[in-house]
Amino acid sequence: MRILAMTRAHNAGRTLAATLDSLAVFSDDIYVIDDRSTDDTAEILANHPAVTNVVRARPDLPPTPWLIPESAGLELLYRMADFCRPDWVMMVDADWLVETDIDLRAVLARTPDDIVALMCPMVSRWDDPEYPDLIPVMGTAEALRGPLWRWYPGLRAGGKLMHNPHWPANITDHGRIGQLPGVRLVHSGWSTLAERILRVEHYLRLDPDYRFNFGVAYDRSLLFGYALDEVDLLKADYRRRIRGEFDPLEPGGRLPIDREPRAIGRGYGPHAGGFHPGVDFATDPGTPVYAVASGAVSAIDEVDGLVSLTIARCELDVVYVFRPGDEGRLVLGDRIAAGAQLGTIGAQGESADGYLHFEVRTQDGHVNPVRYLANMGLRPWPPPGRLRAVSGSYPPATPCTITAEDR
């Protein structure tokens, strides 16, 4: 079995040697594109014994962020792989480390033939002396990535300007995607809040409408659910939570779903298709839905097999939208205790997942539901190390095409 590792570098001297060392543990060849680096990247590549092929762009070309668009760079790497014809390809960024708790070669050798690509967790390194516990106090910094796939002739890259998956756009023509426990990608970039803010500003200059980020706002995805103009609020919430100052939580109060692993399929805030006034949790069908807070059922709507329950308490409305997986029904005026079960989630159409749209409203409009939960000491994000893949296209097929008219 032959494993080819590939990466693309531009002034990556700070992290490149460690990345190459981590790839050399299990790969037979390492191919690299050096995109006009002016630091010690070229020297590192020349002296690393595991690097077997380097393509260099002319250093005197214009100093654009990348010489060629991301999709063209991926296409070049795929064509380089055609000359190696490996059994498996691993592609990483030059600031990713690969950590393994398994014999990766042995695992790949016994991977079923119908699995053609593998996902594993990526975690972000955090080293911010001013906000040392921002992770996990404000959320996790984990995601699933797909760095491994089988080589086939004719693989092609996605056509977006940026944020294409590393694996080929047509890889699923050859089989299905699996998960790879025991392997982690460690992202060495964006290890402080200031670096994340700079990255958001950079992406917004290139893609102000988030068209290349699956329609997801860059600030909400990189700043723990907060908007770029809410950084001061993020910092204030962090300091409150560090001091243990939380909003009151009723006896019995809990997350609306607590079966693990869960995932956030679609977050709160602006998206390319409009403003999303809640958060969509993906979970297993059959998962119970619980009332976060007590109140009275003030509205029940059913549309296309979905039920929308609104539980009102004082000046707060909490909305739960899901496809029921049981026959239980509430009626208008029912008094609901905090922690009471409201129903169970059914499967959503073509997806193997079920979804809960969770929304919080006050007299002033919609509020960030993740912040609402977290400021009561509840942690709605996926637990560390307990990531789940969301089936279906991304963003996932959600039952909630709700948009806010006023916010």
Curated annotation (Swiss-Prot):
Keywords: Signal. Pfam families: Glyco_tranf_2_4, Peptidase_M23. Disulfide bonds: none annotated. Residues 1-27 form the signal peptide. The keyword Signal applies. The keyword Ligase does not apply. GO terms for molecular function: metalloendopeptidase activity. This is Uncharacterized protein MT3894. The lineage of its organism: Bacteria, Bacillati, Actinomycetota, Actinomycetes, Mycobacteriales.
